[in-house]
Amino acid sequence: SDPKIGDGCFGLPLDHIGSVSGLGCNRPVQNRPKK
């Protein structure tokens, strides 16, 4: 769970989910790690 792939911790758009909030900060809640 790298905080640079798609955790949304930094407000980055998760893979193709589209969540830009700190919801899955190192926590695969709804933004499960694609890799």
UniProtKB/Swiss-Prot annotation:
The keyword Glycosyltransferase does not apply. Disulfide bonds join 9-25. Coiled coil: none annotated. It is found in: Secreted. One of its GO terms (biological process) is vasodilation. SMART domains: NAT_PEP (SM00183). GO terms for molecular function: hormone activity; toxin activity. Expressed by the venom gland. InterPro entries: Natr_peptide, Natr_peptide_CS. Keywords: Disulfide bond, Hypotensive agent, Secreted, Toxin, Vasoactive, Vasodilator. PROSITE patterns: NATRIURETIC_PEPTIDE (PS00263). It comes from the Eukaryota. The keyword tRNA-binding does not apply. GO terms for cellular component: extracellular region. Snake venom natriuretic peptide that exhibits vasoactive and probable hypotensive activity. Is only weakly active on natriuretic peptide receptor-C (NPR3). Belongs to the natriuretic peptide family. Negative results: does not activate natriuretic peptide receptor-A (NPR1). This is Natriuretic peptide TNP-b. It comes from Oxyuranus scutellatus canni.
